Amino acid sequence: MAASVENRRFTHHEPAVNGLVRTFKPVPNSHRSDSPDLGRQIPSSPKKQVATGEDSSSEDENENDYKELIQKGNGELEPSILDPRDEATADNWVERNATMVRLTGKHPFNSEAPLTRLMHHGFITPAPLHYVRNHGPVPKARWEDWSVEVCGLVKRPARFTMDRLVTEFRSREFPVTLVCAGNRRKEQNMVKKTIGFNWGAAGVSTSVWRGVPLRDVLKRCGIFSRGRGAFNVCFEGAEDLPGGGGSKYGTSVKYEMAMDPARDIILGYMQNGERLSPDHGFPVRMIIPGFIGGRMVKWLKRIIVTTKESDNYYHYNDNRVLPSHVDADVAKAEAWWYKPEHIINELNINSVITTPCHEEILPINSWTTQRPYTLRGYAYSGGGRKVTRVEITMNGGEKWRVCALDHPEKPNKYGKYWCWCFWSLEVEVLDLLGAKEIAVRAWDEAHNTQPEKLIWNVMGMMNNCWFRVKTNVCKAHMGEIGIAFEHPTVPGNESGGWMAREKNLETSSDANQSLKKSVSSPFMNTSSKMFSMSEVKKHNSAESAWIIVHGHIYDCTHFLKDHPGGADSILINAGTDCTEEFDAIHSDKAKKMLEDYRIGELITTGYVSDSPNSTVHGASNTSHLAPIKEIAPLRNVALIPGAKIPTKLVYKKSLSHDVRLFRLALPSDDQVLGLPVGKHVFLCATIDDKLCMRAYTPTSTIDEVGYLDLVVKIYFKNSNPRFPNGGLMSQHLDSLPIGSVLHVKGPLGHVEYTGRGNFLVHGEPKFAKRLAMVAGGTGITPIYQVIQAILKDPEDETEMFVVYANRTEDDILLREELDDWAKKHEKLKVWYVVKESKREGWEYSVGYIRESILREHIPEGSDDVLALACGAPSMIEEAVRLNLEKMNYDTKNSLIIF
């Protein structure tokens, strides 16, 4: 049976990550002080219209009905912040909500709220959670300096300041749902890649907008009639964009649309009772209800009345639905972009299932089976058309059930509906148990409905096929059976969703057919174990370390000690999906080795339900919302295990023809890196659209504040016939300009020097009074770090004997520092070995590391000696290990290899 949907009421208390209750206080104004005028009081608009002489209508009577909803939503928001991801971009002054899902990397800022978070706030979306579509940097604007020019086919061209717009024209205020034409695009990208990025199902938001009617402004300026050629009204923004060789963002609407009082088109200057935020077009933008967001120009500067539609690059090369056979090359070659019949203006009908949410598991027990489960979601249509019906099917469309609808808005006086509505349907849990999927479709008053199957187009726009949630029966918790729900995709570039799984299965070998059956069937195929994401997250320690790579789950616990990079290389990713990072740093051989540790597949579900329907003990109905993570203040230590931290290149110096010193500034100038002596970090960069990660040991001291130094050898192209392309990361670093941002992740490594002769190796303590240190090439950096730590502590009496091998004398890294230390400290002895010497008087060894060299320059093996080595594997095995064994070293226990 169906039950009506009510606006949910929420307290201001949310469970924090640690289980404690946190209270969020309302944030009256989250705008940056960099734009001080944002907080100025807006001049009052006239109570009666003064622009056109028309009688004011009753259309404003209900404009204050949403104040309580706005205040409630703002009261549940954490403050917006200056996100570190924006630090090196032109948007580094814009404050943003940290929970927003970024869809295009760091810049430009394109984002949507997590779907559960969006639905939690109900009808009115708080401005910081409203989806954002930016084509470039956010323009910096001041209220008092801004003006909007009206020109073209008008009798009285004018330029209106913001104060004039607000005081000389009546203002309208009403709720409008904005939708990006790319909403749900990722579903299209899973079928075939479009030219657009991965919008999820939250590219939709609703706010209360206040602004000046466009028709009033145009009438004030004396807009010409159609008979005199006024066919189109063009809008142009302020941002500088690259499209078409350089342009502003611009578009247009038909004259009839612009002048239609039923259309409620406004020049918006307030959102939810406050001035627009920078991301949403401060100080003024177009609001065109019922249209796609791409027509609502932000940072509005010009309104031009013309005969022809806008000739702007973005008007023609964006927001089009081309036939499915037309790809990007065909569209360009055959000029499809310029065919007017393919332009998008009004939104189409669409609906989405939001409850059950993605990754939800509904336990099947005596409690849940005795009461119905409520399915929920949203629906919208365009052009002011009312959504009249929403239907659910659980058997592929053979039978449909009509849902209850909740329309929180009132239509305007012309009967137009500008906002989304919410639907709900109560179903029996046993019916869900027998269903393979749940699908939804909506209808509007023009009897438009959603197609069953996805219709691909090159821009991936207006996707409105049935929204399907897959169900699987699984073992949920404590042996309990549950129903796992999976949405088609997750937004952005994150992995997850049943479409990704089915795509992987379609391209997999015949050996994976049993897995395919297990995913497509509502009952588990026990030949392949399935685990939820919440179960994987529990295995994040040395006692049990699981990782996810390409949807497969691997138990790497028994490989921790054998991993060449040390246990930390695994533990830093334990309990997570590390697909991208694994692919970035591992060879095909390593990928094959991983298969030995495969234990099952990911069903991308978590046990704790995100839905209020599954609260077993009557918890608050806010329990379906994922806990809001508190934004912690910047720590004194920069490194956060498992996280990538941004650093900025602030200095670089050539130490030789192929050696560079790079100085990277930490996120805060009062931070230390937080890297234990002997460990290293991954340096992360995107090169040719792929993640590249390389391990480096900083040469700066562990207590250096505000930055870290890396000494890097640059492997140029064609400098080594074995590696004709050179080093990918080192050449990238060498090419970077000052100010570039790189990400660092760590700590990593299995060796840690804790001071005064003490080490932890794979967590086991070791001690030595004397250290035999053997390094080759860039392998000197971790040994250099240990030397530095010992010399820095006056009470550390550990003796050090260094043998350092290189190809030539010019290749010796950090020689000046090593020689200086050796002169000043008797406990440090340094000996160099070079393959070839080009000058006379070379006082060190020539050739390779030999037994005779080691016997002369490092101590004989004994209980108080440890050997440290770092270099090429061939050097370690042939020159170090074999010769140390001849010198009475127990290489299993006394040789530490970085």
From Swiss-Prot:
Composition bias, Basic and acidic residues: 1-15
InterPro entries, per this entry? Cbr1-like_FAD-bd_dom, Cyt_B5-like_heme/steroid-bd, Cyt_B5-like_heme/steroid_sf, Cyt_B5_heme-BS, FAD-bd_FR_type, Flavoprot_Pyr_Nucl_cyt_Rdtase, FNR_nucleotide-bd, Ig_E-set
The GO terms this record gives for MF are:
FAD binding; heme binding; molybdenum ion binding; molybdopterin cofactor binding; nitrate reductase (NADH) activity; nitrate reductase (NADPH) activity; sulfite oxidase activity
Its family remark reads: Belongs to the nitrate reductase family.
Name the PROSITE patterns on file. CYTOCHROME_B5_1, CYTOCHROME_B5_2, FAD_FR, MOLYBDOPTERIN_EUK
Q: What does this protein do?
A: Nitrate reductase is a key enzyme involved in the first step of nitrate assimilation in plants, fungi and bacteria.
Quote any Pfam family the record assigns.
Answer: Oxidored_molyb
Instruction: Quote the protein name from its UniProt record.
Output: Nitrate reductase [NAD(P)H]
Q: Domain of life of the organism in this record?
A: Eukaryota
* Taxonomic path: Eukaryota, Viridiplantae, Streptophyta, Embryophyta, Tracheophyta
Q: Which UniProt keywords apply?
A: Disulfide bond, FAD, Flavoprotein, Heme, Iron, Metal-binding, Molybdenum, NAD, NADP, Nitrate assimilation, Oxidoreductase
The record's cofactor note says: Binds 1 FAD per subunit.
Q: Which reaction does it catalyse?
A: nitrite + NAD(+) + H2O = nitrate + NADH + H(+); nitrite + NADP(+) + H2O = nitrate + NADPH + H(+)
Q: What induces it?
A: By nitrate.
Q: List ligand-binding residues for heme.
A: 563, 586
Coiled-coil stretches noted in the UniProt entry, renumbered to this chain:
none
Tell me the CDD domains matching this sequence.
Answer: cyt_b5_reduct_like, eukary_NR_Moco
EC numbers on record: 1.7.1.2
